[in-house]
Amino acid sequence: MKRRTDPECTAPLKKQKRIGELARHLSSTSDDEPLSSVSHAAKASTTSLSGSDSETEGKQPCSDGFKDAFKADSLVEGTSSRYSMYNSVSQKLMAKMGFREGEGLGKYSQGRKDIVETSNQKGRRGLGLTLQGFDQELNVDWRDEPEPNACEQVSWFPECTTEIPDSREMSDWMVVGKRKMVIEDETEFCGEELLHSMLKCKSVFDILDGEEMRRARTRANPYEMIRGVFFLNRAAMKMANMDFVFDRMFTNPLDSSGKPLLKESDIDLLYFADVCAGPGGFSEYVLWRRKWHAKGFGMTLKGPNDFKLEDFYSASSELFEPYYGEGGVDGDGDITRPENINAFRNFVLDNTDRKGVHFVMADGGFSVEGQENLQEILSKQLLLCQFLMALSVVRTGGHFVCKTFDLFTPFSVGLIYLLYCCFERVCLFKPVTSRPANSERYVVCKGLKVGIDDVREYLFSVNIQLNQLRNTDSDVNLVVPLSVIKGDHEFNDYMIRSNESYCSLQIKALAKIHAFVQDTTLSEPRQAEIRKECLQLWEIPDRARVAPSPSDPKFKFFELIKDTDINIFSYKPTLLTAKTLEKIRPVLEYRCMVSGSEQKFLLGLGKSQIYTWDGRQSDRWVKLDLKTELPRDTLLCVEIVHELKGEGKAQRKISAIHILDVLVLNGSDVREQHFNQRIQLAEKFVKAVSKPSRPDMNPIRVKEVYRLEEMEKIFVRLEMKLIKGSGGTPKLSYTGRDDRHFVPTGVYIVRTVTEPWTMAFSKGWKKKFFYNKKTGESFFTLPPESIAPFHTCYYTRLFWEWGDGFHMRDSQKPQDPDKLSKEDVLSFIQSHNPLGP
């Protein structure tokens, strides 16, 4: 066998020459190295390669450059090289071509030494396009911004110590002058240098593509990932953010002693108004937080930015009633029209017992594309009208939150001053959910004072003036004299500090976005972490936004009643006869209601998806053929009653839902509560879902409930009326609280305590008390174990049937001997009533 060192195994001369040339290329170190050194390296390499492969033979040294070039293993495996990130194949290929770190390829190392830079092409810009003016330095150090933090601080204006201005004092406050369309000289409430710097930073983005700016903004804002979570939009999370920061003063207002003003067990609703706030994110949050214990009224401009109630996935939009001013649901919703302001005010007061709402939210804004620096001036009337609406519908002690923009002009600051006078406390606040690069901030007002009517009427007159001056060269430039504003030094100082603070914040945020546009590798590393912290702090579940899936009524019914015996729902009431009359001997335990038709169970799956069932297992749930809406997960015991209004040819008939009892209200199971409490909750629920602005919808009412010992009150409401289609024969009719009447079919009698408890009257204490027949215990307060839950009330109820044989008046047909008369029942009740006649 031939050895590798034999002459026959050596490379041919041609191959040796080729290797020599390769050695010359690989050994070259720089473009400036003399040719003699290259030749010397080539000679040494050739000599070495033309001899033996043995490491010990000849001891002829190779050129260092050539040797390094072919140390593929060290190049591939060395971790110290900045090229170690590349795989071994690419490194070997480069090594074979003679690559050495820090030098270029080529005979004289004339190749480029640095890696080819990534493309600086931005978005869809033309190849090589540079935006003149944008790429210049802003000379703003944005890197010293504070660390992102979920905890926020609130700085309130000092409490206003001056009296609320009256109409006489404000009579000459309004100043009309030449319309002003520049902002650069508005330096009364902000330093000139800061103002101009901010305007410059804003203007830089005028030439930038919007999509490019949005991408950079998304990467630059540490709070960007909060987004809308499972709500309709980001606005909902702004409200959640502010609600937490201000100690839930919107969704859980407190009284003067610091206790909750409203409890879920109370009969009072939390009323709110949402103006200029389509598509309704603020309202969706409030209704999600308070569920059916809140009722909202809304007015916004009709059109593409109207309320999107069908997109309220996390809350029941049935609890919200849009009203568009003059014309109601057919109005235009323009808040600058005085007629709309008055109409909305009257509507809200009529439906809140003339008290007004607990708080108003306003989030108005419109596109100012191309005129971003003039946003404050262009939005001045909108801002005024939102403030005016709040003073028109907020109840005494109520709250107000409204979006504002820059507040540099004396006009805007004057409006803030009027709020400062009308509310107990006021502050300007920018939540972390509001992007730092925009001029958006919120004025938050707490505790409306008494005696603000003159201010409201003054703002109303200013709005009329603004409407008259529209499309002219004149404008209202002042609503409060500068001397008055600056005369209140604490207010003036706060205003300047606030403006300059937000101005500095905005400048840094704009500079940061500018840097992120120029360097697309920059990003905020803590976005996900900050999002998690904020959601936990604000008590918002971290779940995706998903549209509610359609439900099968039977499946939903079993889901709501849980493990309750289905047979309970098929029980029929015990008829009240002479034989069963003894059951109502403990009269203090019973309540009664007038019936108008057959009892049914009604299931609400959201909107108009409403089904009824008569309680028999053999029957199915049937879609209700009425125009009404109910929140999902609602289960009621009802009657569908034909109500009548008027008599004769003008008589009108409408089908109404009458609630006898409630089981589940918008997911809240109330079956274990006392019957009286369930009826109170039913009345509260009906207030929340009623739509006074929609006369085309079938009404929902709660039965009037009477104490059994006061049953004679029912008969006061009974009279003979002519019913259209009855052949001219008067029929017995029961007139309800709303002046509508119906033909009664009988009276339901419901027991409110459960065995072995009963109710009695203490003559010594002159009080009712609860008595346990087994243990002999007695209490003046209601023992929880004595409460009759829904299923007990349902299967123990009695029904006093009135038919054609029922005798109440002499004008009616003769009495049926098998039926109890009015005198029979009333005399029995009176004889067993411990309270006396």
From Swiss-Prot:
Protein name, UniProt field: Cap-specific mRNA (nucleoside-2'-O-)-methyltransferase 1
Catalytic residues (positions): 238, 363, 403 (proton acceptor)
Main location: nucleus
Modified residues (Phosphoserine): 27, 30, 52, 90
Region (Interaction with POLR2A): 726-834
This protein's record includes keyword Transferase: yes
Amino acid composition bias (Polar residues), ranges on this chain: 36-53
GO cellular component assignments: cytoplasm; nucleus
Encoding gene (name): Cmtr1
Domain G-patch: from-to ranges: 86-132
RrmJ-type SAM-dependent 2'-O-MTase domain: residues covered: 230-449
Reaction it catalyzes: a 5'-end (N(7)-methyl 5'-triphosphoguanosine)-ribonucleoside in mRNA + S-adenosyl-L-methionine = a 5'-end (N(7)-methyl 5'-triphosphoguanosine)-(2'-O-methyl-ribonucleoside) in mRNA + S-adenosyl-L-homocysteine + H(+)
UniProt: S-adenosyl-L-methionine binding residues: 233, 276-282, 334-335
Keyword list, A-Z: Acetylation, Methyltransferase, mRNA capping, mRNA processing, Nucleus, Phosphoprotein, S-adenosyl-L-methionine, Transferase
PANTHER family: CAP-SPECIFIC MRNA (NUCLEOSIDE-2'-O-)-METHYLTRANSFERASE 1 (PTHR16121:SF0), CAP-SPECIFIC MRNA (NUCLEOSIDE-2'-O-)-METHYLTRANSFERASE 1-RELATED (PTHR16121)
Quaternary organization: Interacts with POLR2A (via C-terminus).
EC number annotated for this UniProt entry: 2.1.1.57
Binding-site list for substrate: 202-206, 217, 373-375, 438
Entries under InterPro entries matching the protein: G_patch_dom, mRNA_Cap_2O-Ribose_MeTrfase, RNA_MeTrfase_FtsJ_dom, RrmJ-type_MeTrfase, SAM-dependent_MTases_sf, WW_dom
Disulfide bonds: none
Subcellular location: Nucleus
SMART domains: G_patch, WW
Phosphoprotein is among the record's keywords: yes
Residue intervals of the WW domain: 751-785
N6-acetyllysine sites (modified residues): 107
Record motif Bipartite nuclear localization signal, residues: 2-18
